[in-house]
Amino acid sequence: MKKRIMISTAILVLTACVLAGCSSASSADKDHLARVKEAGKITVATEGAWAPFTYHDADTNELTGFDVEVAREIAKRLGVEAEFAEGDFDGGLTGVSRGTFDMMANGVDVTPDRGQTFDFTDPYAFDRAVVVTKAGNSDIGSFDDLKGRTTANSVGSTYAQMGEEHGATVVNVPTLGETMELVKNGTADATINANTSVQDYLNTTGDTSLQIVATDEEVTMYAIPLKKGADNDSLREAINGAIADMKKDGTLSSISVKFFGSDITKE
């Protein structure tokens, strides 16, 4: 009898292990989109300090902005909730590349270098880079004039890279407001930034101590970066589908007008 009990127990344990293994294998076999849907949420990296793309409302302190609301709408159309993780720009990109975050919504522009690390969705907005200096400045009138100068930008941003490519020394600053302060007090000679953000800053603050002195000829395309690999193919397709539907039904345009006063979703 004792022997039979031991054999029966062994069979039960073996059966449990096999079932657990099957369950684990089943979970491992699911791609990124399936895991997101199973979790009921999609984690979104964002700065929360770069108006009007991602920032906190002054009255409610609620996280909002063009990219934030676009991400929320995408999540809604995927049938899940958007869970935001705030941090610096470079950390957000690193988190996506390592799989810590599912995606990033933060005015991330598509570049060849980033294309080696990330799989991008279709672009959902378009912009141009501009050079901003103190009003009255006559020494800097183009991107080439930044050589030997100091610019203020977020670490890891395309704008910081542009500054370095034009021979500038880049000071890393976490927020747009701090960036502008460094330019105004002379700590930085200039900043390269998104035209939309600069225009919003100038209009919102009424600041007349700054000026735009140059605009990049190339159009900046904003898209959502995902960790590179086939595991993300279905998620990218689903997000692309959501973006296409948002363009078609006017939702994307409405969000743009709400935060920029114009439609930047068309090239």
Residue ranges: model-predicted function:
Residues R72, K76, E81-D145:
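Acidic, polar ligand-binding/catalytic clefts
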Residues F84-T94, S138, G156-S157, V171-N185, ...:
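Short helix-initiation/N-cap motifs at beta->coil->alpha
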Residues V108-Q116, M162-E165, D189-V219:
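A ligand-binding cleft/hinge motif common to bilobed small-molecule-binding domains
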Residues F126-T133, Q199, N203-G241, S262-E267:
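Periplasmic-binding protein-like
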